Amino acid sequence: MSIQTIRLSALALAATMVAACYQVPQSTAASGQAGEIFASDQAAGSVIVVDKIGMPSTGWLVVHAVQNGEPDLSGAIGHAYVSAGPSSNLSVPLTTALPAGSEAVVMLHLDTGNAKVFEFANGAVEVLDGPVLRDGKPVMQKIALR
């Protein structure tokens, strides 16, 4: 079993534990349902712009890299704090610019640890700010960078 598989298994376990404690509201927000994300393919660079989200509570809009066609959920390459409810035209600064031809995943995360402190460290066993789940799956969208 590879270290990547172990990390993904740990993330899945953490997401399940978060889901057991927190249910995404099913009510419809003004610009979409809570626990939704809409992002378009965009120009490569050091910022990702997300068209709109519906966030069930305050939390994080997170960018994960894509490796070999799969999201690399072992860490984040960018994050921005977001308020509960609908938001649009959100910018997420990246720690490393992504080149043209690459892909990224934008994902909603809860703020369940220390308020306004992103606690989703690379390789962490305990994930405090885990993903928002809708129907048992992380709320995320893959985008291409051109």
Features from the language model and the residues they span:
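Exposed aromatic-hydrophobic patches
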Residues: 49-50, 86-97
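Solvent-exposed serine/threonine-rich low-complexity stretches and specific carbohydrate-binding patches
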Residues: 73-85
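C-terminal motif of bacterial Sec signal peptides marking the signal peptidase cleavage site
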Residues: 17-20
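Bacterial signal peptide processing site
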Residues: 22-24
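Bacterial N-terminal signal peptides that target proteins for export
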Residues: 1-10
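C-terminal partner/receptor-binding element of secreted or periplasmic proteins
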Residues: 120-146
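Short acidic/polar inter-strand loop motif in beta-rich domains
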Residues: 109-125
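Short, surface-exposed binding/anchoring microloops in extracellular/periplasmic proteins
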Residues: 30-72
